[in-house]
């Protein structure tokens, strides 16, 4: 449990299924927070991660980051582009760690065309 002050109700195992082979398994991964210091599209962010030998993190990997480093999201919002959920209206969302008032928030952000420069993107070494 990440002890978030607020969690989006749409973050469920139904919307973000866990592959059966991963349940109960401990996997070590090398992660990196990408910050581009400029507005960037999801496509460009993923391309730059790929060029550096990384892939976008999933919701599960983002949750581990939030558990291990609970104060990090107070500095900047952190996006996991590796997990996308599409709602009934065909809007696409990605998991995000951020703050709400002074509390830690686990939310879904719209998968936008361009992300503001203050966002960070969690990635995992391939």
PLM regions and their residue ranges:
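A binding-site-centric feature that preferentially detects glycan-recognition modules on secreted/surface proteins
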Residues: 1-55, 60-126
